[in-house]
Amino acid sequence: MYDAYEALLFDMDGTLVDSGRLHELTWRATLDRYGIPVDVPLMRSLAGVPARETLQQLVRHFGCSVDASVEEMVTFKEARVREEAHLHVRATALVEIVRAYHGRKPMAVGTGASTAEAVSTLRRCGLDGFFGAVVGADQVQNPKPAPDTFLLCARLLGVSPGACVVFEDAPMGLQAAGRAGMAAVDVLAVHGIHNDYFLE
């Protein structure tokens, strides 16, 4: 189905991995702890944005006075993710595409999560060993919707951007793929993969 492309690039959360519930619960716990309001449509719109940038935007949006640094809040959320991941994370149906192209096409993961979190999540879902590169938000200057994440994936795989196809669930990620000059697959529209992140 994707034979025309030289490389396949995947977002992780909501695309390769069903983790929407995990991230919603850990965001709710984090925002509650630090007194930041929960705005469901706003959180949904920030899907795919790294935790640091999400927190900065929320504090700015609500004009919050928070007695903690952004780093402290990110550390709290990441710890909750590690503690609760085993309860809420599993691979999506895209694992079939990954298996079908393993050894035939180079593949990479480009995510708004930290690289360490991504590697841990992929391992937990039995997806480690399939990807030539895993690019987390900590590896790029500008996260999605900037193209940096997917451009670095392509560079690490040794493939030109125009020869890549990106699988994404979030508008920010689809924008990033377009800005990188790559074909993009909206996994909800094409593969019926739903992200249950802040639906209500």
Predicted stretch roles:
Residues M1-A7, R99, S114-E200:
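Asp-based, Mg2+/Mn2+-dependent phosphohydrolase catalytic module
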Residues A4, R82-V109, A113-T115, V119, ...:
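Short, acidic loop-to-helix structural element flanking the phosphoryl-transfer center
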Residues M1-M43, R179, I193-H194:
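Active-site neighborhood of HAD-like aspartate-dependent phosphohydrolases
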Residues E24, R28, A51-Q56, V74, ...:
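An amphipathic alpha-helix signature
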Residues V59-R99:
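Metal-dependent phosphoesterase signature
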Residues I36-V38, C64, L127, G158-V159:
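Helix N-cap/coil-helix junction residues
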Residues T30-F62:
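Alpha-helical substrate-recognition element adjacent to the catalytic core
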